[in-house]
């Protein structure tokens, strides 16, 4: 009897023999078997770009292979990470149910990619990660409820699933339930219509960990709020862990009943903010390593500078660059990345001069490594170019003094002021330095215009 994961792995082995390695690594390597819904085999892609391409180019190809392996004719459907979040993820069972043909009925398990090991920690999510790990290690004892809020694609769902996986792995027979508030609402309405409210209540009040996503969609739904209020109370009184996510803190959710709002505030409220540059680069490196991709540092720096909204778009941009490289059969460079991403990066964005771009231009001109700008080295061959880079950062960007200091290894803002004043004074009399800065700025703007 084969599980859907076994079938998908066998499918991938056949696909690999029929595709070039770059194409396979770009399109297929990061896919997973998601679930089996009736006669539809659902496959999870890492982002909507890969999903759309697979849907357009490989649907029938995959269906043929599945039929060859199983003897059954499946419909094939591809979903991406955002769509996955709208699925109900039910209790994970050690021995999953099988259908009449011996294939696992994958009733929406926790996303296998969303574990603590794959979560990249940065300044914007460090506290949320620590709180989630504490909850996973001691459900209902550390923080209950745990309320995580932040924008789309920043890692809220990843942390919730990671808690679910951890609890399942470390606590025998633990019942973990993940779903969206919209799914909760729809099931509640159906249970009333079908006279099955008791079954509905038993389902959601008989779990050890309840993970509920996008709670803001309960706003204005009085009947559903009433039901969730009692579900919350039952689980809390029985010392079961509740984790809730939202795009805003409880106090900012409109038309949310005060009694629910107060309960959400009983435990710990933590936010996740967009990743900073260093975290974005770390995310890209981890993604590249996980997918076995060899991406030059300057390309990751370019992508990280251009995509600063959320993790999903960041990883999607990387896949888009790799895919474009494969399609046009060219090496991955910063120029190729700019070409691949031109449709998703506003032209005004690509013209913005950044501190990291300045560091790169100054470093190239004076033959200084990027990491030396952030190091504590004070030799003149490094300290002087560093001061020039600080000066240009002050002149050519809108960054604050503390921000500039942070980008140069966490230096104090007074160091930035000193560097700016020193270079300003030298420019009054030093024609060579004037020429150097003019050339650096020219190179910098030329590089920006290339992208």
From Swiss-Prot:
Cited InterPro entries: AAA+_ATPase (IPR003593), Chromosome_initiator_DnaA (IPR001957), Chromosome_initiator_DnaA-like (IPR020591), Chromosome_initiator_DnaA_CS (IPR018312), DnaA_C (IPR013159), DnaA_dom (IPR013317), DnaA_N_dom (IPR024633), DnaA_N_sf (IPR038454)
Tree of life domain: Bacteria
Coiled coil regions in record: none
Cellular component GO terms, alphabetical: cytoplasm; plasma membrane
Segments of this protein annotated with the region Domain II: 72-108
SMART domains noted in UniProt: AAA, Bac_DnaA_C
Assigned keywords, A-Z: ATP-binding, Cytoplasm, DNA replication, DNA-binding, Lipid-binding, Nucleotide-binding
Aminoacyl-tRNA synthetase in keyword set: no
SUPFAM superfamilies membership: P-loop containing nucleoside triphosphate hydrolases, TrpR-like
Places the protein is found: Cytoplasm
Binding site for ATP: 153, 155-157
GO molecular function: ATP binding; ATP hydrolysis activity; DNA replication origin binding; lipid binding
Pfam families, alphabetized: Bac_DnaA (PF00308), Bac_DnaA_C (PF08299), DnaA_N (PF11638)
Gene Ontology biological-process entries: DNA replication; DNA replication initiation; regulation of DNA replication
Record-linked PROSITE patterns: DNAA
Region span, Domain III, AAA+ region: 109-325
NCBIfam families (alphabetical): DnaA, PRK14086.1
Family: Belongs to the DnaA family.
Entry note about domains: Domain I is involved in oligomerization and binding regulators, domain II is flexibile and of varying length in different bacteria, domain III forms the AAA+ region, while domain IV binds dsDNA.
Assembly mode: Oligomerizes as a right-handed, spiral filament on DNA at oriC.
Role: Plays an essential role in the initiation and regulation of chromosomal replication. ATP-DnaA binds to the origin of replication (oriC) to initiate formation of the DNA replication initiation complex once per cell cycle. Binds the DnaA box (a 9 base pair repeat at the origin) and separates the double-stranded (ds)DNA. Forms a right-handed helical filament on oriC DNA; dsDNA binds to the exterior of the filament while single-stranded (ss)DNA is stabiized in the filament's interior.
Protein name: Chromosomal replication initiator protein DnaA
